[in-house]
Amino acid sequence: MLAGVAATAQTKTVDHFTKVIVSPYIQATFVEGTEESVTIDNIKVDESKLHIEVNNQTLRIYLDGAKDYPKYEKDNSNGYEGSHPLYQNRSVVVTVTYRVLTDLSLRGEETHLCKSAITATTFTLKIYGESDVTFNELNAQELETTIYGEAELNLKAGTVKDQQYTCYGEGRINSESITGNTSRIIAYGDADLTLNVSDRIKITAYGDAKLHYKGDPEIVKGLHFGDMQIEKIN
């Protein structure tokens, strides 16, 4: 396929996986289905640069030279030394069809959507960079979320009994539309969280974290340095 030329979406069947790692410059939508696959909806680079691999039940989708983090290359075209991204944002758009999904790692600045309702005992989510991540519905006993950077996470429906959030940087989390019992927050930086739990929230903050919450949970303050703000909302 030629880079930048529109074509009919291609679907690749893959081995069984329960965990997905999506690398920078790739935008993904996740849907539940009966057969596990990756559909390439749009691609702006040479297809040979795209890798879709499954090892130890982990699906990895990445581009050459940008497997883990965004990469830059030197540019002297204007008479002075500079750099530009190795690829454009949204160089690849994919749809991932899963049967079981328990672990998700997203890297870069793309927008990602978990379109189908996800049900798991424990769901682990890691976000690196400035991604915008939305779950239409998540139901789990426990959610373990770690955000590195300025990413935004929105949970639109569901029930997660125990919610654990660790934020490094200025991440924004909105789980107001899901219900839960307890939450534990550790924030390094200026994270902003909006939660809806019934029993207990414990927050530890190193920086100017903000917590907005619905319901009447017990608020437990751990160590905190900086201007931590806590607000009850209707």
Segments (PLM) and residue ranges:
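Sec/Tat signal peptide C-region and signal peptidase I cleavage site
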Residues: 5-9
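Acidic (Asp/Glu) and glycine-rich low-complexity loops/linkers
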Residues: 10-126, 137-146, 156-163, 228-234
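Short beta-strands and strand-coil junctions in structured, solvent-facing domains, enriched
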Residues: 28, 112-113, 132-133, 152-153, ...
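Short, surface-exposed interaction patches in beta-rich subdomains
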Residues: 153-234
